[in-house]
């Protein structure tokens, strides 16, 4: 069996490359009993039809609830000597959360919209129910993750502190599909941090969540990690921070270990557009948070923005470099020269808006690549602009 977790639509071509390199038939219909079962999961599985022909089945939701059931079914059928791909997929489709595309029939209206979506057998569920793990603290977590022989992007200990989000950004699929917000107990997180650092030898630990600042026991956890990481010379990474919720005290404590850049995600340059997407950030929030960061000794800031959001205008786009320049000016105006930790480095990273299912913007129009690049060029005058180039994925 091969499990592929797909988080972004731009990674679809990687799926085909993986199958091709493994010499597995690309289409599910072309695979035989000796080929592995290709299981899809992750956020993209909530809208599986664009890639349904390449997968044998999809796991809709969070894997902790039904993975054992699914894998035990596969092992038992293999051990019995009665295994066949068709029989296994039929039985797997009865497991809550498992979607087998080949066992459903779609009828369309004349205008191309769906008229009906029905299972081809009576014992197959008509509706797939997403799986939600309501006990993150008690769930199995990889305490000894595999350490690759080569340098990987996620070359660090990843510690999931919570799942879900208390915010409601209208473009964010994760904030919708991972509801309700659930936290992992701080005692369990301390145990995991110690075990994972000892078993991997990584020099960085990252706290994973959609909004790390909103974790209720963040200060206690950070204080513990500082003590642990200081002994091992390990860096602490705090992604997914909201400027309006970021604690200066926590920031200064983390800074004492090892310097790294702070990452903020205003998503839109103008206040008007931030209100449209329900981001909940004002210019004052952003500048106050940046000021506190600079006073705390930081001089590197990454800003993430999204282009192509609904109702976006040229004025909204030009507000992106303007906001970055305002933050940079704040650094030099408020931090005395003798206290500066080098030059202020602000990096703007832009991605393009992709309408996601199960979000308020799911029916919004998506830009084509040329439109996106044209909008990105508006901010090109800013030295450290990074924009995704769609051609590289093809």
Locations of regions flagged by a protein language model:
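Structured alpha-helical segments in the cores of large, soluble enzyme domains
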Residues: 38-41, 45-48, 67, 157-165, ...
